[in-house]
Structures are given as C-alpha cells and as structure tokens.
Amino acid sequence: MASADEVTDKTELDASGLKVLPGLVDIHSHGAVRHDFSDADVDGLRTILQYEKSHGITSYCPTSMTLPKEELLKIFQTAKDVEQDETCARIVGINMEGPFLDPAKKGAHVEEWIAER
C-alpha cells in the first residue's frame, strides 16, 4: 500500500468543519421525480438514479410492486439495460415487494397477482 505522499494523481479537499459521510444505500424506493421503477422506462430509471446520486445515495435497490410475471420480467430488464455512469447511483439489487406475499396480509397489493408458490 502506498502512503499518501507517494500518490501522484490525487485531489485534496479541505473538509475542516464539515461532516464527511460514506455514500448512502437506499434499499426501498419505488421511484422519484415523477418516475416509477415499475413503469419499465429506461430513461425514467436513469433520471431516478441521477436524482438519488445528487442526494447522497450511491447504492440503490429499486423496488417493484406485485405485478404479473411478464411485467416484472420487463421491469427487471430495464434495470439491466439502464446506462449507469458517475452521475448515477449504482443499482446493487432489486427489492421485490411481491409477488410472494401472504394474501391475508396483502395490503394494497392486487391479490390475483400474488404467486401461490
């Protein structure tokens, strides 16, 4: 491991009087700025990722709703297809709110889309 004095390509910031935090992780978010992950819109998801990053979120788990399998597969493909760069929070997983739920505790989830197994 090199010492700080040996590193030639570095930028030093004066953080005196400031609080320095690691990037935050958002593990449950359906969307932001008028976009929803379940819309399966690549541009919308990229906008969400940029918004999250601009607010200190560096790692992100977009959350899906209980939907038919075909729709879920399309939504998950969106997460695979979205272009992520340094302006975006990084997708580190997907939070599936359904379809694997107890129908007795389904809340707002549509029962016909809850998987039996």
Predicted regions and their residues:
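A glycine- and small-aliphatic-rich helix-loop capping segment at beta-alpha/alpha-beta transitions
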Residues: E6, A40-G44, V110-E116
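Metal-coordinating catalytic core of metallo-dependent amide/deamination hydrolases
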Residues: Q77-R117
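Di-metal (Zn2+ and/or Mg2+/Mn2+) metal-binding site signature of metallo-dependent hydrolases
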Residues: L18-V42
